[in-house]
Amino acid sequence: MKMKLYRAYAKVNIFLKIQGSRGNYHEIVSRFMRVPSLYDELSFVPKESSEEFELIGSFSCKREQNTIYKAYRALLEFLDEASGLHVENLMQKYAVKVTKNIPTFAGLGGGSSDAATFLKMCNEVLHLGLSQNELALIGLHVGADVPFFIYGYNSANVSGIGEVVEEFKEELLDIEVFTPQLEISTPKVYNLYRENFYNPVDGFEVERLKKISSKDALSAMSAAEANDLFAPAIQLYKELKNHYKYGYYFSGSGSSFFRVKEKENI
């Protein structure tokens, strides 16, 4: 098999508002935007071990907790026996090599992007014939952000618990990302939001946000106004205050901040 490098891009949340709750999950409305300058690289390489599933790369978690492995298990669950055997045979011969550039626990979707890219790699290499909608359905079992990365849009309105992804046609902004050396727990941030900050956005505001360009949205809102998780994250991780700078916005549950680079005058 000819070795090919696949890029798994980061994302930022231009805005992230909570619409309500669904059991233990929160329903959101958010504008996801791809960051072309920040990506992990994935490839299949010949295996050197007898492990059922081999990952090569710098990971801070056990294999069973890795989103790529979770995507592998979810893919097998979805496929019929014959197609599942093709996937298993592939992983008996090849390992997944990952060059990590996207910081983890940072609100940039690195793990979700890796999982989505792995699913697309398997679909392409093995000619599984899965549609984007089917891949997104599989990916949702791995994480709420995975469907966005499956579709590969530059920009999209994401709602529900992540399963509704609607392309938003606009130019990509030149995003600069800054990630403090802090590991943020997304569940803890959401739990504190529900306990102390719960104030769902109304339907009229949801529709307005879905129509506004990302550039205009950022111009009109502060970091706290744009992201409902900013306040609980700051309360939980007080060090974040020391890293916040005027003109920067907060992505996901953190810890990353981002801004739009100013165009240089020539």
UniProtKB/Swiss-Prot annotation:
Pfam name, any one: GHMP_kinases_N
UniProt keyword Isomerase, yes or no: no
GO MF annotations in UniProt: 4-(cytidine 5'-diphospho)-2-C-methyl-D-erythritol kinase activity; ATP binding
Record: residues binding ATP: P103, T104, F105, A106, G107, L108, G109, G110, G111, S112, S113
Pathway membership: Isoprenoid biosynthesis; isopentenyl diphosphate biosynthesis via DXP pathway; isopentenyl diphosphate from 1-deoxy-D-xylulose 5-phosphate: step 3/6
Entry EC no(s): 2.7.1.148
Enzyme superclass (EC): transferase
GO aspect biological process, one term: isopentenyl diphosphate biosynthetic process, methylerythritol 4-phosphate pathway
Active site: K11, D145
Keyword Magnesium: no
InterPro entries: GHMP_kinase_C_sf, GHMP_kinase_N_dom, IspE, Ribosomal_Su5_D2-typ_SF, Ribsml_uS5_D2-typ_fold_subgr
Catalytic activity: 4-CDP-2-C-methyl-D-erythritol + ATP = 4-CDP-2-C-methyl-D-erythritol 2-phosphate + ADP + H(+)
The entry's keywords: ATP-binding, Isoprene biosynthesis, Kinase, Nucleotide-binding, Transferase
Similarity comment: Belongs to the GHMP kinase family. IspE subfamily.
Function according to Swiss-Prot or TrEMBL: Catalyzes the phosphorylation of the position 2 hydroxy group of 4-diphosphocytidyl-2C-methyl-D-erythritol.
Name under which the protein is recorded: 4-diphosphocytidyl-2-C-methyl-D-erythritol kinase
Native organism: Sulfurimonas denitrificans (strain ATCC 33889 / DSM 1251)
Gene: ispE
